[in-house]
């Protein structure tokens, strides 16, 4: 026995030495194997060797990932978790690999476990919030908090069961609430299907918590995959579903119900006879309504309304448009509409027409559903009753659950649904002014079971024809010509290049203040360079005969723009002269558009613009210096995401950028100041978590789905979010990208004193940014022209406050993620 123990000790010692040597030589796989052996033989050394083991595991896992050896990667993590079952760092790392390989449900489980093991882990928290947004979309909370919607569905289901429906199938059950309505109403047999693994597991928990397990059969599958009698014993008499989006058809209700009527439902009740067993659907029918609308906010996100930006002519060579109308092909996966809560759109909107009926849908008629799926088009003439700029169609629907109960999603209704918005893009860049008496002709179709509204023509009234000089389009022929000219290619020299931009990128292109501010800041740097050169010439002429003076340097400023997405800042910089600008655009379409614009603006002959995607990224994703030995004069960083959050790894990117600047070089912007305000907002509460059992009519759902709540609410328009300000604005955070030593987040937690200016209940901290390009020029992301949205952090527990109180807001900022907590100072 003594000999075996000594042999074991020698093996452990040799393996440990070998692991150390392997790590020095970056042989991470062998090092991991040696350490695994050591810890298996000597578990008492786990604590001492934990960091070394983690390092070798993570490095080896990265190599396995690069080699596409996913199974070996997961085997390593399973071995590691056997040794360290409660290690939050390993759990979090395992989740990261699962997420990047597409296993989001499984990743969520590991992130959640890591967060439970270490609630203060910023990495695990950020990862869990990110995956939670993927798995449980925010509309689940809004829908479950919609008491009226829940009451109407419950009443309609009760009526159906009282009228003889005995077998119920809930398609797309989500949390299972409709199934529980059916069971509580007395349905003998209730089945429910859900495709999402996370939602299915959540529904299982919820059904069990409400003492209905064994009474509701939950199926983890699409309804299209349900087989009789393998999954359910027979055809059902009632299908309940809420697979409808703002455009009604976007979640596939038409295809789903066509399949259900053919394979899962009893035959519908005949109109001229009475049968004991028949099939029906809740909702029974719907009417879609539409309206032509003027809306400046929609316009600036979906139509480029400027011909020149900070000295850069946009011209006619490039046609910018959003993805929504860029393609109508059979393989196009882009929804033909966006969605908005029209009652909350900044600046509001103006109705140019009365509401018109787009189409009616009978969900209890297989023939009606198949007609919709056929994609046949219907043309509707819409009279204009009020003059305005025609920007978009909006649609909403009235959902008839049964003969007695209905729901409406019209803009004036307080409902969980938004409205569908169809920006009109088949118009000249100047837009389209319509007058009272004109007629807008629209084609309505569902070629891929998505609702589409396409502008056909605008027929002018006689009074409008008399004012054609004031109109963008004089008659129907002009419009047809404009529509024909829209879809062009670059096959001919004079044709437009199509460049597809996201709505945020279009709003950025329309943001004149943004571009002019950067132009002014770059101009100041060029001016200071010219002053230095002038002083150099004077010194040289004083020191020697002017004929032998050294020539002025012809070196140009090297400006690197690493903005995300499409950016014309390199063109603006190059246009100023004495600048060689580098663009890091990634999409070929964007690069071609910038090249076209450089030709229009006479920047193509002197090599003022260069694309540096190949130079931009190192193995670590860091910016490199130019091809020449010269360092960067200006590096432009994209610091704030359009959604309203600080970009991930901003401080790390700024640190790399500082190392690549020439002496006197600058990072634009040089500083970011986060501004905040305490508010009371029931709306944000309802959009972020289920508010107890009352809105869900007594069912226990909130504790389960609220595990997936995320405190940061993004893409907000603070000017229209229903809220009550309870404090003045105050500085939350300051990030100096040029001088990191002056940043105020040096400690792990910052404590900010906030004075309460109004009594109420603090539910959230809204925030936005002042972006300081240089010491004198700044941008406000909350301004009316801003292309950035704002954000809010919803507090874990609302706090009642009194006017005149002083509270402490604890802010933790780490790795570009943030958490906040409101407390009262100790007396």
UniProtKB/Swiss-Prot annotation:
Main location: cytoplasm
The TPR repeat ranges on this chain: 54-87, 88-121
Signal peptide limits: none
Pfam families assigned to the protein according to its UniProt record, in alphabetical order: PrmA, PRMT_C
GO BP field: chromatin remodeling; methylation; mRNA processing; regulation of DNA-templated transcription
EC numbers for this chain: 2.1.1.320
Gene Ontology MF term list: histone methyltransferase activity; protein-arginine N-methyltransferase activity; protein-arginine omega-N symmetric methyltransferase activity
Assigned keywords, A-Z: Cytoplasm, Methyltransferase, Repeat, S-adenosyl-L-methionine, TPR repeat, Transferase
Catalytic activity: L-arginyl-[protein] + 2 S-adenosyl-L-methionine = N(omega),N(omega)'-dimethyl-L-arginyl-[protein] + 2 S-adenosyl-L-homocysteine + 2 H(+)
Gene Ontology CC annotations of this record: cytoplasm; nucleus
Ranges where the SAM-dependent MTase PRMT-type domain occurs: 124-453, 511-827
Localization per record: Cytoplasm
CDD domains from the UniProt entry: AdoMet_MTases (cd02440)
InterPro entries per UniProt: Arg_MeTrfase, PRMT_dom, SAM-dependent_MTases_sf, TPR-like_helical_dom_sf, TPR_rpt
Function of the molecule: Arginine methyltransferase that can both catalyze the formation of omega-N monomethylarginine (MMA) and symmetrical dimethylarginine (sDMA).
Record family assignment: Belongs to the class I-like SAM-binding methyltransferase superfamily. Protein arginine N-methyltransferase family.
Protein name: Protein arginine N-methyltransferase 9
Record organism: Xenopus laevis
Organism lineage string: Eukaryota, Metazoa, Chordata, Craniata, Vertebrata
């Amino acid at each position: 026995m003594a000999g075996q123990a000594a042999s074991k000790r020698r093996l452990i010692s040799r393996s440990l030495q070998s692991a150390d040597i392997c790590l020095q030589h970056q042989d991470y796989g062998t090092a991991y194997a040696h350490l695994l052996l050591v810890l298996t033989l000597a578990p008492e050394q786990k604590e001492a060797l934990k960091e070394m083991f983690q390092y070798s595991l993570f490095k080896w896992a990265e190599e396995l990932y690069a080699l596409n050896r996913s199974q070996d990667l997961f085997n390593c993590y399973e071995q590691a978790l056997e040794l360290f079952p409660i290690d939050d760092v390993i759990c979090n790392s395992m989740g990261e690999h699962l997420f990047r390989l597409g296993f989001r449900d499984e990743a969520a489980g590991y992130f959640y476990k890591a967060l439970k093991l270490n609630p203060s882990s910023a990495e695990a928290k950020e990862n869990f919030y990110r995956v939670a947004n993927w798995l449980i979309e925010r509309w689940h909370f809004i829908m479950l908090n919609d008491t009226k919607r829940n009451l109407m569905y419950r009443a309609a289901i009760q009526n159906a069961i009282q009228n003889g429906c005995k077998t119920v199938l809930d398609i797309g059950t989500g949390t299972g609430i409709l199934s529980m309505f059916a069971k509580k109403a007395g349905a003998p047999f209730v089945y429910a299907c859900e495709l999402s693994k996370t939602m299915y597991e959540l529904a299982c928990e919820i059904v069990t918590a409400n003492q209905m397990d064994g009474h509701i059969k939950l199926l983890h599958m699409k309804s299209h995959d349900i087989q009789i009698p393998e999954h359910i014993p027979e055809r059902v008499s009632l299908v309940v579903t809420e697979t409808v989006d703002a455009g009604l058809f976007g979640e596939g209700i038409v295809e789903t119900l066509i399949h259900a009527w053919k394979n899962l439902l009893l035959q519908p009740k005949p109109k001229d006879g009475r049968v004991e067993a028949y099939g029906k659907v809740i909702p029974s029918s719907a009417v879609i309504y539409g309206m032509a609308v003027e809306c400046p906010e929609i316009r600036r996100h979906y139509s480029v309304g400027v011909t020149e930006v900070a000295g850069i002519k946009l011209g006619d060579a490039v046609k910018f448009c959003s993805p929504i109308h860029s393609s109508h092909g059979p393989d196009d996966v882009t929804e033909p509409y966006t969605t908005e809560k029209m009652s909350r759109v900044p600046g509001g909107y103006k109705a140019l027409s009365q509401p018109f009926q787009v189409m009616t849908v009978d969900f209890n008629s297989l023939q009606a559903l198949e007609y919709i799926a056929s994609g046949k088009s219907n043309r509707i003439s819409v009279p204009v009753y009020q003059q305005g700029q025609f920007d978009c169609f909006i649609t909403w629907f009235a959902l008839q659950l049964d003969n007695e109960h209905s729901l409406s999603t019209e803009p004036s209704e307080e409902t969980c649904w938004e409205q569908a918005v169809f920006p009109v893009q088949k118009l000249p860049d100047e837009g389209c002014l319509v007058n009272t008496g004109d007629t807008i002709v629209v084609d309505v179709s569902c070629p891929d079971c998505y609702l589409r509204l396409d502008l056909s023509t605008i027929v002018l009234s006689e009074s409008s024809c008399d004012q054609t000089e004031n109109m963008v389009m004089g008659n129907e022929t002009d419009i047809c010509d404009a529509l024909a000219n829209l879809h062009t290619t670059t096959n001919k020299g004079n044709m437009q290049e199509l460049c597809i931009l996201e709505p945020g990128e279009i709003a950025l292109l329309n943001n004149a203040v943004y571009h002019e501010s950067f132009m002014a800041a770059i101009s100041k740097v060029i001016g200071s360079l010219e002053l230095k050169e002038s002083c150099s010439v004077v010194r040289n002429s004083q020191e020697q005969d002017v004929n032998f003076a050294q020539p002025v340097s012809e070196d140009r400023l090297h400006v690197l723009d690493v903005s995300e997405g499409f950016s014309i800042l390199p063109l603006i910089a190059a246009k100023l002269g004495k600048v060689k600008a580098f663009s890091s655009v990634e999409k070929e379409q964007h690069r071609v558009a910038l090249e076209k614009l450089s030709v229009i603006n006479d920047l193509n002959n002197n090599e003022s613009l260069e694309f540096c995607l190949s130079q931009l990224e190192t193995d670590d994703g860091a910016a490199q210096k130019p091809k020449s030995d010269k360092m960067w004069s200006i590096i432009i960083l994209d610091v704030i995401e359009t959604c309203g959050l600080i970009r991930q790894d901003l401080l790390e990117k700024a640190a790399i950028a500082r190392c690549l600047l020439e002496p006197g070089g600058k990072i634009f912007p040089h500083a970011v100041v986060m501004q905040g305000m305490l508010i009371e907002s029931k709306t944000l509460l309802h959009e972020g978590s289920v508010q107890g059992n009352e809105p869900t009519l007594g069912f226990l759902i909130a504790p389960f789905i609220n595990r997936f709540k995320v405190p940061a609410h993004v893409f907000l328009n603070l000017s229209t979010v229903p809220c009550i300000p309870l404090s003045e604005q105050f500085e939350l955070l300051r990030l100096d990208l040029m001088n990191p030593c002056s940043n105020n987040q040096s400690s792990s937690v910052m404590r900010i004193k906030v004075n309460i200016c109004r009594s109420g209940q603090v539910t959230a901290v809204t925030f936005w940014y002042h972006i300081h390009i240089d010491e004198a020029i700044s941008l406000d992301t909350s301004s009316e022209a801003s292309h950035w949205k704002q954000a809010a952090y919803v507090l874990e527990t609302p706090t009642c406050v009194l006017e005149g109180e002083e509270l402490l807001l604890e802010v933790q900022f780490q790795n570009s993620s943030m958490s906040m907590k409101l407390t009262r100072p100790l007396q």
